[in-house]
């Protein structure tokens, strides 16, 4: 079971970002030069765990709950104001130009808890982002209107990644509140 921790986006934020993306990068999908991520798949990955057996997933969920009981993490507000392109991965993304410390703390904690139960060991630095396009062969021109979205998160989730006939979909396995 491929799992990861993430911040989900509210439907209104998904709609706003989709409208901006479609207006800003109209021609990007022509000729298969890029594949847009379905709005329902927009999220911010906090920590990718990879394939984790169900019994280990249960242990992981218990440890996350215990960790939050002992040291709660505050709700997270983000200003999504930066557009980026990772050429090697072919990913066009949106993210905050400044990552709040509580978000970095949450991502680091989840990564550490996951590694203790056999989750994927990842040495990459955390970079909060929402993937807009995959398989983007060339960097797109800058948008006419810069991104500027406000996101507020009161919880985070553990998602399962499922590959189907229509591509990838994500299913919520568990949800944890952040403290107000």
Name each region found by the language model.
Residues 1-180:
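Histidine-dependent nucleotide/RNA phosphoesterase domain, centered on the 2H-phosphoesterase fold
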């Amino acid at each position: 079971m491929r799992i990861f921790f993430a911040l989900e986006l509210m439907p209104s934020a998904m709609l706003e970002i989709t409208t901006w993306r479609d207006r800003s990068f109209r021609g990007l999908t022509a000729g298969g030069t890029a594949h847009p991520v379905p709005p329902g798949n927009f999220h911010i990955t906090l920590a990718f765990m990879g394939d984790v057996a169900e019994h280990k997933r249960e242990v992981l969920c218990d440890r996350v709950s215990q960790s939050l009981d002992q040291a709660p993490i505050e709700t997270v507000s983000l200003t999504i104001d930066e557009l980026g392109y990772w050429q090697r991965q072919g990913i066009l993304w949106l993210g905050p130009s400044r990552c709040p410390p509580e978000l970095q703390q949450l991502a680091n904690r989840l990564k550490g808890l996951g590694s203790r139960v056999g989750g994927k060991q990842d040495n990459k630095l955390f970079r909060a982002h929402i993937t807009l396009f995959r398989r983007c062969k060339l960097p797109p021109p800058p948008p006419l209107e810069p991104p500027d979205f406000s996101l507020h998160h009161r919880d985070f989730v553990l998602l399962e990644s499922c590959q189907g006939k229509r591509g990838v979909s994500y299913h919520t396995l568990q949800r944890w509140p952040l403290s107000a």
